[in-house]
């Protein structure tokens, strides 16, 4: 402080030789006051910048938390959907294997009937031990009387009905 007042005195003496000590004290006090106000204003601006930075970081944290929550929700939904589709795929794979096995068995039966068809009588093929169809004049079966082809339990006597796959909702 002594250096600033001595500097001021040297400059004031160059102004005209007015060496009034009260004037120099007033100007030094006014400079101190201005510097103090300037420092306060600078500190206030610094605090405001710091607070704005903290507020910006808080807003960024909130935004990232929301994004993280949305991603976790999306991941949960996707995982549940994946598990559901995987379960359906397992059921469909099991049904496909079952149907493939049935198809293979039916193809083996067809191959057996076709390869040994001449050796089997019709009564052996229909599974009942007899043939209730009548042979017409031309040597072909006469199926005009359809009631003779129906058994008393409500089904056809013939066993070559298609085999249906189990329904997915049956389990």
From Swiss-Prot:
Q: Can you supply one Gene Ontology CC term for this chain's record?
A: nucleus
The primary site where this protein sits is nucleus
Instruction: List the SMART domains hit by this protein, alphabetically.
Output: BRLZ (SM00338)
User: Where does the record place a coiled coil?
Assistant: none
Q: Which SUPFAM superfamilies match?
A: Leucine zipper domain (SSF57959)
User: Which Pfam families does this entry report, sorted A to Z?
Assistant: bZIP_1
Residues covered by the bZIP domain: 29-92
Keywords associated with the record: DNA-binding, Nucleus, Transcription, Transcription regulation
**Localized where?**
Nucleus
Alphabetized InterPro entries for the sequence: bZIP (IPR004827), bZIP_plant_GBF1 (IPR045314), bZIP_sf (IPR046347)
* Ranges of compositional bias, category Low complexity: 1-24
Ranges where the record places region Basic motif = 31-52
Q: Where is this region: Leucine-zipper?
A: 57-71
Tell me the Gene3D superfamilies matching this sequence: 1.20.5.170
Q: How does it assemble?
A: Forms heterodimers with BZIP9, BZIP10, BZIP25 and BZIP63. Component of a ternary complex composed of BZIP2-BZIP63 heterodimer and KIN10.
**Primary role:** Transcription factor that binds to specific DNA sequences in target gene promoters. BZIP2-BZIP63-KIN10 complex binds to the ETFQO promoter to up-regulate its transcription.
Report the protein name in the record. Answer: bZIP transcription factor 2
């Amino acid at each position: 402080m002594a250096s600033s007042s001595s500097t001021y005195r040297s400059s004031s003496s160059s102004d005209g030789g007015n060496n009034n000590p009260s004037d120099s004290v007033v100007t030094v006090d006014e400079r101190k006051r201005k510097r103090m106000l300037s420092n306060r204003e600078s500190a206030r601006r610094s605090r405001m910048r710091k607070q704005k930075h903290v507020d910006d970081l808080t807003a960024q944290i909130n935004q990232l938390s929301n994004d993280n929550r949305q991603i976790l929700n999306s991941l949960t939904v996707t995982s549940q959907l994946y598990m559901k589709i995987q379960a359906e795929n397992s059921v469909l794979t099991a049904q496909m294997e079952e149907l493939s096995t049935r198809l293979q068995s039916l193809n083996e039966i067809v191959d057996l009937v076709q390869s040994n068809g001449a050796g089997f009588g019709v009564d052996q093929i229909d599974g009942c031990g007899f043939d209730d169809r009548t042979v017409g004049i031309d040597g072909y079966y006469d199926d005009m009387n359809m009631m003779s082809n129906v058994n008393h339990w409500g089904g056809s006597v013939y066993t070559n009905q298609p085999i249906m796959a189990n329904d997915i909702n049956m389990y």
